[in-house]
Amino acid sequence: RKDYSWPGGRRLALCITTNIECFAFGKGRGHDNAKHGEPQTQRNYSWRDYGNRVGIWRFFDMFDELKLPAAHNTNSLLYDYAPQIFDAIRRRHDEIVAHGRTNAENLRDFMWEEDEARVIKDVTDTFTGNERSAPKGWMGAGTYENSTTPDLLKEAGYKYLMDWPCDDQPIWMRTRAGPLLCVPYPAEINDS
């Protein structure tokens, strides 16, 4: 395939991305490597809660020390749960990538296109209202989506999505509203 070059003649680009997620204890989905398909437990809740209380702050310290920019796939309900995380993201001038409302639900929970469009709008409006600009990127909770999700994201103004781990470089996807950039997410190194 065609050689892919980055601006300035650079040959390599790296996307540093964290997933900052929130869950209500005992409600909705809660992935657990040890017990697939079982309801959420204190183990998978506390594992994720640790990330918001301790883990993300260690990442921020490391990113600051190494002077690395980052993008953060972030649930919109986090504004209610841990708004101090957004203060740190703003201070660092990092990018916020919309990541659904909560990882206790995903877009496959919404069977009708209109329902999914409302969820995308709700998430987008929450970020826009808090950050004064809409997020450019989207990664669905659990990287789940429906057959029309790329169409709905493009129609909602998104420039890229990260739900397709289909390549080692960005690719363009066709949608009914025009091209949408797919930035492949390395699912094989995700902590879940």
Predicted features by range, described:
Residues 1-182, 187:
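Catalytic alpha-helical scaffold of carbohydrate-active enzymes acting on polysaccharides/glycoconjugates
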Residues 190-192:
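Aromatic-anchored helix/helix-loop segment that forms the rim or "lid"
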